[in-house]
Amino acid sequence: MRGKQKLFAVMLGVVSVIAFISCRTRVETREHSKLETRNRFDEIHFPNQILWAWERPEELEFLDSQQFAVAFLAQTLVLKNDDVEYKPRRQPLKVKPDTRLIAVTRIESQKTTALPAALNATQKQKLIDLILKTAPLRNVSAIQIDFDAARSEREFYKTLLQELRQKLPDNIPLSMTALASFCIGDRWLDDLPVDEAVPMIFRMGTDSRTIKTFLTSGNDFREPLCRRSYGIALDEPLEINFDRSRRKYIFNVRPWTEKDLLALPQEVH
């Protein structure tokens, strides 16, 4: 009887060691993959200051193209039942010939009908095809996807990004926007095939005070993909220590003017 107990104890110990090694390997592999996530923006020496240009006329020929880039809304795609409604940009955008651009695609789910978005393979393929068409546009150096992912939509968007990354030219950066709360305590951004997840540190709703307190206390975003850039608004100044090495995406509620650049916080430059 004692021999069987001893054998059982030895076997239990071996199983525990194997389980520990397996668990540690998975953790190390995940951390290793995070460290090796490419940053194509750095590879192509992309400017660190980027102005968002939404659906309105924008005259940005005053920008220094060595310091500033422009992320312009190229299209809005609305998921309606089992279809995709295409809304192209209709407002003019004027920039210098050498200004580098990011083509932004906004994806929304139609919520005014009784039928929710199907989130099926056909819709996903339509989205990918339409997004890919923005890559060859003049002066476009990168692609950005802007969406609000409900918990039930996350798997759809994850596979969308995975398939989109596979079809994009390897040298084109893929960016996405992310709620700041995702960057602090949500694991769903893990292993997404993007070069950055831009934390939107403005218009944060009920999370605003909590997140601003978290950042002004000297804390940083826990998700590595969120530690490559900031998404801020000109009319919502933040008292945080900006990391100057990170890209800053800046939103303005009105069309940009040269005077607006003077209002940018010194830490943003």
Where are these predicted regions, by residue range?
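Boundary/entry segment of secreted carbohydrate-active catalytic domains
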Residues: 24-67, 73, 86-89, 99, ...
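Chitinase-like catalytic core of GlcNAc-active glycosidases
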Residues: 45-47, 80-194
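Substrate-binding surface in catalytic domains of secreted glycosidases
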Residues: 165-233
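C-terminal active-site rim and adjoining tail of enzyme catalytic domains
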Residues: 208, 213-215, 219-269
